[in-house]
């Protein structure tokens, strides 16, 4: 056994070297040298000085003691290839290719010290470490029932494989992984019943930070990064690097181990791909666990839930997605599941609600699994229950595309007729949904509302304000197994379906648009063909809502005084919504052109023949009508030549339409009868 010890004023350096066929470290003799070049030696590093750093270099060291101990007798612990002990910090420089294989219940690189272990590759020679733990022990970290804590990796290539029930990097069986930091290098961590990085079986993964490097973390029956099977994953921060995390069955990609929550997860940068195992979220909760306090402020994040799990949020069977905030970055979140038992893109897993979700900025694409919301609640679970609701969802900015599939685009998950018949389930409601800004596309299908309730769910308390640009769409059922083509509301309730085959379209509700300024709501209902391979959906119905008009000016007509200063009566020239509600407008003459400007997307200009004659008399030859996205020029002479006592011109977004004299007369009667 070779020891690098710090037992006096300055810490010493132990530097094992390999020669042909296998030279021992100074002061030690090789034990059972093997034909494959591995030593039977072990290395123990002890630094008992808390204020000293012991520096060790591993250069082409290969140790294999994996045949020691008894995996069936937990009292017979095998040897650790390399063990770090003591109160002080130890820094290991990696040069060349190093391999450590430990016996049963011992970690490949076992750390029992309270100080910090740092693996680095600062020299010019590239270095790597492959560490494999015995059964119940981590690749790097704790042995059986041991914690793996205060571990830092700054460089090199590190491959860590945990033995059965242990983490790749972190805790052994029943041990937690805590205070693990990766700032650089390439790290591949794989577990079996533990987390890739984090806790072993029943152990938590806490205070894990990744600021750089390339990290691949795979949990087999544990989270990719976070808790081992049955362990919570919390206080996980990613600020940079390229991170790929995949959870095993029932475990989150980043977050909780099977049956546990994932909480306090923060991503501020880097590229992150997180995939949940079956029944678990990509980022957040595991099977039955919630995803709480998840914040994304930057980077590129792709999160995919397993069956029943949210992309970001809760796991299956009641896992909620709570207090989720996105402030920037590019986020793609996809809920898992097919034909029910599905999670939301962002929000709840199956039977789980999505609550207190806020998007302030960034580009967000959220797609729910079958009968789940894009943002909000999950579907009915595999064993029944109600679909999840979407509550207290706020969008203040950014670009948000949210698509539900039987659930709302934004709001509640859906309950199919079969769920009602079999389980007595209820659809998920969507309530207290506020959009204050940004560009939002919310699409519901299979009876889910664009914004509001999922299939058989209710929508209420929807507010759109500021400069928000909202497109809310609903698509009629295209399920060949369902005899009707019912639709949810664009904003409001999901459609109602009953086990006896009856269906009712979802009721539209009026969103509160009292605070809307320059934004709008575009409502679209699509009528698809039942053949999946046929032409694209056609629009069945479409309408717009715009900011409520401000109180009209005291004189909302046009006065010839503004032209030539000649006293004339006020001209009958008006701007209004397409429904006839007066809108404020400005007029200005430039030469022979009268410009009429209204700061609205859709508006109608109309006036009398008397107005046209008076304008022509005062030198106006053409009228230029200007709205947000469209400018149209009308000839005064041509309008007069058409005859009729009224004229009208409509702008609807980018489209203009001049009404004929007869249509204008009809409009006059409609508006003023």
Residue positions per predicted region:
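A composition-driven surface/loop motif
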Residues: 1-555
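Long, contiguous ectodomains of secretory-pathway proteins
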Residues: 20-26, 32-46, 52-78, 85, ...
């Amino acid at each position: 056994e070779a020891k690098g010890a710090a037992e006096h004023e300055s810490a010493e350096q132990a530097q094992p070297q390999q020669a042909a066929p296998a030279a021992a470290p100074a002061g030690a003799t090789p034990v059972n040298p093997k034909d494959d070049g591995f030593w039977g030696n072990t290395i123990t590093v002890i630094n008992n000085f808390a204020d000293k750093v012991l520096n060790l270099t591993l250069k082409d060291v290969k140790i294999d003691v994996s045949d020691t101990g008894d995996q069936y007798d937990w009292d017979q612990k095998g040897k650790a290839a390399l063990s770090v002990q003591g109160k002080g910090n130890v820094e290991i420089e990696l040069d060349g290719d190093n391999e450590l294989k430990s016996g049963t219940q011992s970690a490949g690189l076992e750390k029992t010290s309270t100080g910090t272990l740092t693996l680095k590759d600062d020299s010019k020679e590239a270095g790597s470490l492959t560490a494999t733990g015995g059964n119940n022990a981590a690749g790097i970290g704790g042995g059986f029932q041991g914690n793996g804590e205060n571990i830092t990796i700054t460089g090199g290539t590190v491959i860590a494989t945990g033995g059965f029930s242990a983490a790749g990097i972190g805790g052994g069986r029943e041990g937690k992984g805590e205070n693990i930091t990766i700032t650089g290098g390439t790290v591949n961590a794989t577990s079996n019943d533990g987390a890739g990085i984090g806790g072993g079986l029943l152990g938590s993964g806490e205070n894990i930070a990744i600021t750089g490097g390339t990290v691949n973390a795979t949990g087999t029956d544990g989270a990719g990064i976070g808790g081992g099977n049955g362990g919570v994953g919390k206080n996980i921060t990613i600020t940079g690097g390229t991170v790929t995390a995949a959870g095993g069955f029932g475990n989150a990609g980043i977050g909780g181990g099977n049956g546990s929550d994932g909480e306090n997860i923060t991503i501020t940068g880097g590229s992150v791909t997180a995939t949940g195992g079956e029944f678990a979220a990509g980022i957040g909760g595991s099977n039955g666990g919630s995803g709480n306090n998840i914040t994304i402020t930057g980077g590129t994040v792709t999160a995919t839930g397993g069956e029943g799990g949210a992309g970001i949020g809760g796991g299956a069977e009641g896992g909620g997605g709570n207090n989720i905030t996105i402030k920037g970055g590019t986020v793609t979140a996809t809920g898992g599941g097919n034909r029910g038992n599905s999670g939301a893109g962002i929000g709840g897993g199956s039977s789980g609600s999505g609550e207190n979700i806020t998007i302030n900025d960034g580009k967000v694409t959220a797609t729910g699994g079958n009968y789940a919301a894009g943002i909000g609640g999950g579907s009915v679970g595999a064993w029944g229950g109600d679909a999840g609701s979407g509550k207290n969802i706020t969008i203040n900015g950014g670009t948000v595309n949210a698509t539900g599939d039987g659930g709302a685009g934004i709001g509640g998950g859906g309950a199919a007729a079969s769920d009602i018949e079999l389980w007595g389930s209820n659809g998920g409601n969507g309530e207290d949904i506020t959009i204050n800004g940004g560009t939002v596309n919310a699409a519901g299908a299979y009876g889910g509302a664009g914004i509001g309730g999922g299939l058989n769910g209710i929508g209420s308390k929807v507010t759109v304000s500021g400069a928000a640009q909202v497109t809310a769409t609903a698509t009629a059922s295209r399920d060949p197994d369902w005899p009707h083509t019912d639709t949810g509301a664009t904003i409001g309730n999901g459609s109602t379906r009953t086990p006896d085959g009856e269906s009712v379209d979802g009721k539209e509700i009026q969103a509160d648009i009292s605070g809307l300024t320059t934004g709008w709501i575009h409502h679209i209902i699509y009528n698809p063909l039942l053949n999946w391979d046929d032409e694209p959906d056609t629009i069945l119905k479409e309408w717009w809502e715009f900011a409520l008009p401000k109180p009209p000016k005291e004189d909302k007509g046009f006065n010839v005084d503004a032209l030539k200063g000649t006293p004339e009566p006020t001209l009958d020239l008006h701007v209004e919504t397409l429904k006839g509600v007066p809108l404020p407008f400005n007029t200005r003459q430039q030469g022979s052109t009268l410009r009429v400007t209204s700061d609205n997307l859709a508006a109608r200009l109309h006036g009398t023949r008397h107005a046209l004659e008076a304008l022509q008399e005062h030198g106006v030859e053409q009228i230029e009508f200007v709205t947000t996205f469209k400018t149209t020029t009308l000839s005064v002479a041509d309008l007069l030549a058409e005859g009729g006592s009224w004229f009208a011109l409509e702008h609807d977004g980018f489209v203009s339409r001049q009404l004929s004299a007869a249509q204008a007369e009809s409009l006059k009667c409609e508006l003023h009868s």
